């Protein structure tokens, strides 16, 4: 099964939709309020709330693209989406899932797995949006090819502006406890640092 996930991740990275088109970066436009359960999560897991670090934009190489795809697919296949109410008896409870969780839990696990592989916390931002009138959380990865979204609703890693969501806010780079409102998309340049 693991070899199948790696093969699929490699094939997706080669045929990656964000490799063929110009990517976009999220423009931020001031302070936003974080989701209510975010602060209690940060008190329990400060390392996963961090966005500290010097690398703000990762230079995306084929092996890193493959890692994004592999982790997105692997976590999506291992973790069953279930509401917080069903799992812990609360409407909103951010945590690292082991078997099941909702969208923010799944995004947190993806951030954890990328950080274990050496990805900088400063380029891995928890991001909130809406989809069909419901709140939704994804992981945004800042790269020189655009801000890419790892999402529990799809196996595809996509440029954020190519998703069906209305984005509200994301963690601020350099201060993970602060959140910023999301504005328009801006074409990306080529300035990035490796990991």
Which role fits each region the language model picked out?
Residues 19-195:
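A structural boundary/capping signal
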Residues 7-17:
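Bacterial N-terminal signal peptides
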